[in-house]
Regions:
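Alpha-helix-loop-beta-strand connector modules within alpha/beta enzyme cores
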Residues: 27-49, 74-89, 120-147, 180-189
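Catalytic cores of alpha/beta
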Residues: 45-60, 88-100, 132-135, 139-140, ...
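Glycine-rich phosphate-binding active-site loops on the catalytic face of alpha/beta enzymes
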Residues: 64-74, 105-118, 150-180
Length: 189
């Protein structure tokens, strides 16, 4: 992509897990390759709930789910790094040390197939409810999102979107990414 498009990416979350996911040295090698690209384009690399991998490559941060390493422990392990936390309900929000995280991943907005243990979908109303709890923390919407959803998601209060399936399941991932990036840029102008 031309540099102009890459500026739309605020961060890249490395999420390589599940039965089909790479393991061991193969996973480490892929993470290092992704990190090289991220550094080249000045995009922070966040590792999804793999503390060992995040430490091994000195990632820019880590993203945690509600059942992962505690945010307090993560902040001690990763001082000065970006820490994100998945939050899907008001109860999860109220029971989480939000003041210790840099952003929240809110959702899933829609039912998702990319995560076996996904929580129930919260819909646009759930996204709006989470935004009302705190208008200051950066909020990234997650959960089976596509280009057609971007405008509504941003209007519901999200600051950004996290995508897997909209790109990985696309017939032409490059073209799908281009459409998403161009759409996000058009909305942020």
């Amino acid at each position: 992509f031309p540099n102009r498009r890459l500026r739309t990416f605020r961060l890249f979350q490395f999420r390589e897990k599940g039965e089909q996911g790479l393991k061991g040295s193969d996973k480490l090698l892929l993470a290092k390759q992704v990190q090289h690209l991220c550094h080249r384009y000045q995009v922070p690399l966040i590792i999804n709930d793999d503390v060992e991998l995040a430490c091994a490559i000195d990632a820019d941060g880590i993203h945690l789910g509600q059942g992962d390493l505690s945010v307090v422990e993560a902040r001690q392990l990763f001082p000065g790094k970006i820490i994100g936390l998945s939050v899907g309900t008001e109860e999860e929000y109220l029971n989480s040390p939000i003041e210790l995280v840099d952003y929240i991943g809110s959702g899933p907005v829609f039912p998702t197939l990319s995560k076996d243990d996904a929580s129930p979908a919260i819909g646009m109303n759930g996204l709006k409810q989470l935004r009302r709890l705190n208008s200051d923390i950066p909020m990234v919407a997650i959960g089976w999102l596509s280009a057609k959803d971007c405008k509504d998601i941003l209007q519901a209060g999200a600051d950004g979107i996290a995508l897997i399936s909209a790109i990985s399941h696309a017939e032409d991932p490059y073209e799908a990414t281009k459409i998403l990036v161009d759409g996000m840029q058009a909305m942020s102008v």
